[in-house]
Swiss-Prot record:
Localisation per UniProt entry: Secreted
GO molecular function: cytokine activity; cytokine receptor binding; hormone activity
Function text: Paracrine hormone primarily responsible for maternal recognition of pregnancy. Interacts with endometrial receptors, probably type I interferon receptors, and blocks estrogen receptor expression, preventing the estrogen-induced increase in oxytocin receptor expression in the endometrium. This results in the suppression of the pulsatile endometrial release of the luteolytic hormone prostaglandin F2-alpha, hindering the regression of the corpus luteum (luteolysis) and therefore a return to ovarian cyclicity.
Family: Belongs to the alpha/beta interferon family. IFN-alphaII subfamily.
Originating gene: IFNT2
Keyword list, A-Z: Antiviral defense, Cytokine, Disulfide bond, Hormone, Pregnancy, Secreted, Signal
Location (main, coarse): secreted
InterPro entries (alphabetical): 4_helix_cytokine-like_core (IPR009079), Interferon_alpha/beta/delta (IPR000471)
Protein name: Interferon tau-2
Length: 195
């Protein structure tokens, strides 16, 4: 039994190490986590979106940037990572925990963290020394501005139930776009180490 466990550990270490690329493939697990997160967001619905129509806002989701051909492969990974990180940050707040069912919120945050952890296995290899420059990359700045608009909206609306419902619907759109980006990356080869 100990031998089998040791062998499995060795295989995992080799596949995720610098020589192996298993850790940098966009796996089915990542896509399953994304779908599960969307289902959780849907289940978090507490109000009818129709009752909050007066609070609607266009947050300027950079959908065309992600779904179009504007992003190159070397930009797509950092944008995907930033979208997931910002989504996690949004839901991992005191204001958020006051607005949602705690169990569903914890499951959503765990799912987002799992996606980020999976991407973290590749992040250093994909972004390397360019990491500091990528923070200033236009698509990343666009994503940050988009999420800042969401934070500003919530604050302006006093973190009301309707404001959170509008944001929940918006985050379903954003996570759908990030899933589309994951699919694009997979079609680009899936191996995030390849140029």
């Amino acid at each position: 039994m100990a031998f089998v466990l040791s062998l499995l550990m060795a295989l995992v270490l080799v596949s995720y190490g610098p020589g192996g690329s298993l850790g940098c493939y966009l796996s089915q697990r990542l896509m399953l986590d994304a779908r599960e997160n969307l289902k959780l967001l849907d289940r978090m619905n507490r109000l009818s979106p129709h009752s909050c129509l007066q609070d609607r806002k266009d947050f300027g989701l950079p959908q065309e940037m992600v779904e179009g051909d504007q992003l190159q492969k070397d930009q797509a990974f950092p944008v995907l990572y930033e979208m997931l990180q910002q989504s996690f940050n949004l839901f991992y707040t005191e204001h958020s925990s006051a607005a949602w069912d705690t169990t569903l919120l914890e499951q959503l945050c765990t799912g987002l963290q799992q996606q980020l952890d999976h991407l973290d296995t590749c992040r250093g290899q994909v972004m390397g020394e360019e990491d500091s420059e990528l923070g200033n990359m236009d698509p990343i700045v666009t994503v940050k501005k988009y999420f800042q608009g969401i934070y500003d909206y919530l604050q302006e609306k006093g973190y009301s139930d309707c404001a959170w419902e509008i944001v929940r619907v918006e985050m379903m759109r954003a996570l759908t776009v990030s899933t589309t980006l994951q699919k694009r990356l997979t079609k680009m080869g899936g191996d995030l180490n390849s140029p």
